């Protein structure tokens, strides 16, 4: 149905998360309608990113330098580590400009159905880091999915043994949200995470 190069492009686009066959087809046609220079710039950006971006040896965030910009910032509070599953979670927290400590990126969540156990994540490195540094608090900023809950329980069990306070970010209602539209789990978490005013 498609010429071989177009079929290959669609096939490769489909491998991206959240991209199904129809979206891959739309993206491929869009790219081919644009000037050739734009497609080449996109290809060059992909090549540069894959060649120049690695992971920070300390926090495992994506970075072109080692250690990363965040780990090198002198004003960061080294006694607090925020644990996230993926670099995109770190970016979301950084956008708030509220957290002033350091991070640790696990590289995923425990998921036995997909064959991902604690050994496949950067948990050993986290425990070594907490044990070696003067860490007073470990904040678990992990999504409240089944895999996230499993990972949170596993981490809290092993991190607590090392001595620091283990906390978890609160989950609840979004700003501007209506109570009547919130699901039971969200409301329960909001009630659990309430604080004095």
UniProtKB/Swiss-Prot annotation:
PANTHER family attached to this UniProt entry: RECOMBINATION PROTEIN RECR
CDD domains: TOPRIM_recR
Source organism per UniProt: Gloeobacter violaceus (strain ATCC 29082 / PCC 7421)
Keyword Glycoprotein: no
Protein name: Recombination protein RecR
Database matches in PROSITE patterns: RECR, TOPRIM
Domain of life: Bacteria
Function: May play a role in DNA repair. It seems to be involved in an RecBC-independent recombinational process of DNA repair. It may act with RecF and RecO.
MF terms in GO: DNA binding; zinc ion binding
One Pfam family matching this protein: Toprim_4
Zinc finger feature spans (C4-type): 56-71
Keyword vocabulary terms for this entry: DNA damage, DNA recombination, DNA repair, Metal-binding, Zinc, Zinc-finger
Similarity annotation: Belongs to the RecR family.
Domain Toprim: 79-174
GO biological process per UniProt: double-strand break repair; recombinational repair
UniProt xrefs under InterPro entries: DNA_Rcmb_RecR (IPR000093), Rcmb_RecR (IPR023627), Rcmb_RecR_Znf (IPR015967), TOPRIM_dom (IPR006171), TOPRIM_RecR (IPR034137)
């Amino acid at each position: 149905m498609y010429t071989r190069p177009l079929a290959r492009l669609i096939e490769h686009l489909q491998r991206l998360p959240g991209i199904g066959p129809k979206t891959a087809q739309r993206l491929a046609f869009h790219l081919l309608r644009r000037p050739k220079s734009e497609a080449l710039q996109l290809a060059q950006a992909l090549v540069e990113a894959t060649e120049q971006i690695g992971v920070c040896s300390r926090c495992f965030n994506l970075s072109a330098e080692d250690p990363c910009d965040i780990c090198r910032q002198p004003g960061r509070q080294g006694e607090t580590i925020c644990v996230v599953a993926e670099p995109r979670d770190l970016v979301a927290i950084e956008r708030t400009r509220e957290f002033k400590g350091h991070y640790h990126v696990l590289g995923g969540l425990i998921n036995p159905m997909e064959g991902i156990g604690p050994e496949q994540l950067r948990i050993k490195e986290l425990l070594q880091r907490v044990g070696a540094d003067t860490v007073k608090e470990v904040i678990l900023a992990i999504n409240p999915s089944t895999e996230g809950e499993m990972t949170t329980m596993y981490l809290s069990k092993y991190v607590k043994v090392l001595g620091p306070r283990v906390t978890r970010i609160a989950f609840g209602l979004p700003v501007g949200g209506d109570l009547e539209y919130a699901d039971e789990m969200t409301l329960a978490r909001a009630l659990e995470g309430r604080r004095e005013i």
